[in-house]
């Protein structure tokens, strides 16, 4: 396909989803089954309104059954499923349309997702796309019966280990996904939707207490310092604001945010997307709070020249202001998080520093209610 978007000054090629691949393979299989012919390409309409002309491969014909594949192209998106082959096996049924997952397609084991527990992880929009192409082909050939469709993915079980599926409780393979049929490179929307899906799963287990960490540093610190497992919460990446929004929308009452100062300090400036491309402000935020705590002009100048928050904390330590400044920042973080949540949830924060130290030796600061919330989360973990 030749669809492009411009992002961060670069022209990036779009791709197509596993859902589009599945629908295309099904359409090709149905055409070859009903038309008693062989085709090497097929056109499918996507929900986004873009028509795709996709190549068909691995054609295997039997008397009443056709199997074929479509290779996914994720464009310029760094997608682990790029290049995967999605297969469809199509055969006739008397009336209904049955869509099932075969080898390499995940199986849902936890509630809260768009597919029911026990079902193949083929999401509603791809299922609808499959039904629409079958209806189209049936009308073309005057066919009044039904179809059995089995979708599979080459090496799907191995590839799935690199996706969010294990954390979502989807086992044995990848998911057939896509709401638009098109992959936009580095799509923030796709990342946020993944976080939402993970929250949906976790709140079916517990929506009273919730752990949020931006990434692996926070996850490891939470586990090794406090015994808190991210299974009781989510990794939110840079999307702290969107995560808080969705947690509050789902009536989560108590949220504990644990992360490194380099990311969390930005929240003290009201920055809710902490990616450096969106905003930085680390030096400015630390410098402002250092000034409030009585730092010298030389100290503030040194902070403004620093490259990392760990370097800043060394400067503050030498000035005798490390604790005061970090606590001041922490209170402002809590203020902005409460404001974002419209004061509808109790939010506590743990912020740690010194990435070069061993986990057990890292300095950390916490808001007044964080210790009690950690205890409650530990109790919930014991129940689970």
Curated annotation (Swiss-Prot):
- Pathways per UniProt: Cofactor biosynthesis; adenosylcobalamin biosynthesis; cob(II)yrinate a,c-diamide from sirohydrochlorin (anaerobic route): step 6/10
EC assignment: 2.1.1.195
GO biological processes: anaerobic cobalamin biosynthetic process; methylation
Question: Among its keywords, does the record have Transferase?
Answer: yes
Q: Which Gene3D superfamilies match?
A: CbiD-like (3.30.2110.10)
Is Isomerase there in the keyword field?
A: no
Swiss-Prot/TrEMBL catalytic activity: Co-precorrin-5B + S-adenosyl-L-methionine = Co-precorrin-6A + S-adenosyl-L-homocysteine
Coiled-coil annotation reads: none
Which protein family is it in? Answer: Belongs to the CbiD family.
The UniProt entry, under PANTHER family, shows: COBALT-PRECORRIN-5B C(1)-METHYLTRANSFERASE
Q: What is this protein called?
A: Cobalt-precorrin-5B C(1)-methyltransferase
Name the source organism: Ruminiclostridium cellulolyticum (strain ATCC 35319 / DSM 5812 / JCM 6584 / H10)
């Amino acid at each position: 396909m030749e669809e492009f978007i411009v992002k961060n000054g670069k022209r990036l090629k779009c791709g197509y989803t596993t859902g589009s691949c599945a629908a295309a393979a099904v359409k090709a299989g149905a055409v070859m089954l009903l038309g008693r012919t062989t085709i090497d390409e097929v056109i499918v309409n996507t929900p986004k309104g873009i028509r795709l002309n996709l190549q068909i491969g691995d054609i295997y014909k039997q008397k009443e059954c056709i199997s074929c594949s479509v290779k996914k192209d994720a464009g310029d998106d760094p997608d682990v499923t790029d290049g995967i082959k999605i297969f469809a096996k199509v055969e006739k049924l008397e009336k209904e349309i049955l869509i099932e997952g075969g080898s390499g397609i995940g199986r849902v084991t936890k509630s809260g997702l768009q597919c029911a527990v026990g079902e193949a992880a083929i999401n509603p929009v791809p299922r609808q796309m499959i039904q629409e192409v079958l209806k189209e082909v049936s009308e073309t050939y005057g066919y009044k019966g039904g179809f059995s469709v089995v979708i599979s993915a080459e090496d799907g079980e191995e590839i799935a280990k690199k996706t969010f599926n294990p954390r979502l409780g989807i086992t044995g393979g990848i998911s057939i996904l896509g709401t638009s049929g098109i992959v936009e490179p580095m799509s923030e929307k796709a990342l946020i939707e993944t976080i939402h899906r993970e929250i949906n799963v976790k709140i079916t287990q517990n929506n009273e207490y919730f752990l949020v960490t931006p990434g692996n540093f926070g996850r490891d610190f939470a586990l090794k310092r406090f015994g808190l497992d991210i299974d009781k919460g989510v990794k939110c990446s840079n999307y702290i604001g969107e995560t808080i929004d969705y947690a509050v929308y789902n009536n989560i009452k108590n949220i504990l945010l644990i992360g490194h100062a380099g990311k969390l300090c930005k929240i003290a400036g009201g920055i809710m997307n902490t990616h450096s491309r969106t905003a930085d402000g680390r030096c400015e935020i630390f410098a402002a709070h250092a000034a409030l705590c009585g730092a010298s002009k030389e100290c503030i100048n040194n902070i403004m020249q620093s490259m990392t928050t760990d370097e800043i904390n060394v400067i503050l330590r030498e000035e005798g202001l490390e604790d005061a400044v970090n606590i001041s920042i922490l209170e402002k973080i809590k203020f902005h998080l409460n404001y974002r949540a419209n004061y509808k949830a109790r939010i506590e924060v743990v912020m740690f520093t010194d990435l070069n130290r061993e986990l057990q030796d890292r300095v950390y600061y916490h808001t007044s209610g964080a210790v009690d919330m950690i205890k409650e989360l530990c109790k919930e973990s014991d129940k689970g």
